[in-house]
Design a protein with these regions (language model features):
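Short secondary-structure boundary/capping segments
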Residues: 32-33, 62-63, 114-115, 152-153, ...
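Phosphate-binding site of ATP-dependent enzymes
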Residues: 134-221
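Conserved N-proximal alpha/beta basic substrate-recognition cap immediately N-terminal to
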Residues: 2-100
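Active-site nucleotide/adenylate-binding loops and adjacent lid/helix of ATP-dependent enzymes
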Residues: 67, 76-162, 170, 212-213
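Conserved residues at the C-terminal ends of beta-strands
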Residues: 44, 104, 188
Length: 225
């Protein structure tokens, strides 16, 4: 039925779940039941259709969603946002402004991809799946583009690689939106002489007051996913 039995496990100081073992005498909370009428599910890292990883979590969330549970965010939203190329396609369909982006399927396509971006180096190379600034690479020439794509495909022949125009900026902005309303925004300054602004790479976020255009574009982007 729609009522689900939920088990909870403690988390250690490093944020890792402590799963029970054969000799583990740790005490765990008793399982409890949830139902769609009184439960809000907040899911993180549910897996991707591109990379299996913890895909079982995605299936579990999809099952809950099909039974009427409310997820933040929805499974389809996770699917779109976990894949930068999928995200790019959805934004294009909804006329959301983004940097010019090309999918590069193999190293032989590097020259054509660079041409489509006007051969304006530097450019930014990204793996379609990734976070925390990992897999985001600064490309200064066609030669380095070709060799970098070769290396990525040697490590994973099925990896999707995106080539993107470089837009010089001192920061980026993250906006928190729920139910079509803006709850807040942070500015993430670029790190030193790096080109990335990820907090996990050392950027120190600060509060940010959105311009009217930033607010409207953020709301449109959120609505599209």
């Amino acid at each position: 039925g729609k009522n689900q039995l939920v088990y909870s496990f403690p988390v250690d100081d490093d944020g890792k779940v402590e799963l029970p073992g054969m000799k583990d005498d740790a005490e765990y909370d008793k399982p409890f039941r949830i139902n769609p009428e009184n439960t809000l599910v907040m899911a993180r890292g549910i897996g991707s259709t591109v990379k299996t990883g913890n895909l079982s979590w995605r299936v579990a969330c999809l099952n809950l969603e099909n039974q009427g549970y409310t997820l933040i965010n929805s499974v389809i939203c996770h699917d779109i946002c976990n894949d930068k190329w999928y995200n790019q396609i959805v934004f294009q369909q909804n006329d959301i402004h983004t940097p010019n982006t090309v999918l590069v399927r193999h190293s032989e396509g590097a020259e054509d991809a660079a041409k489509r971006l006007g051969n304006k180096f530097p450019m930014i190379l990204k793996t379609a799946v990734g976070s925390r600034g990992v897999g985001v690479i600064w490309i200064e020439s066609l030669k380095s583009l070709h060799s970098t794509i070769q290396l990525l495909h040697r490590e994973d022949e099925f990896v999707d690689v995106l080539l993107q125009e470089y837009i010089k900026t001192n920061y980026d902005v993250r906006v928190i939106i729920a139910s079509g309303k803006i709850l807040g925004a942070i500015k993430r300054p670029v790190i030193g002489d790096d080109f990335r602004s990820n907090v996990s790479q050392g950027s120190e976020p600060e509060s940010h007051e959105l311009t009217e255009r930033e607010a409207q574009e953020s709301l449109r982007a959120a609505a599209s996913v």
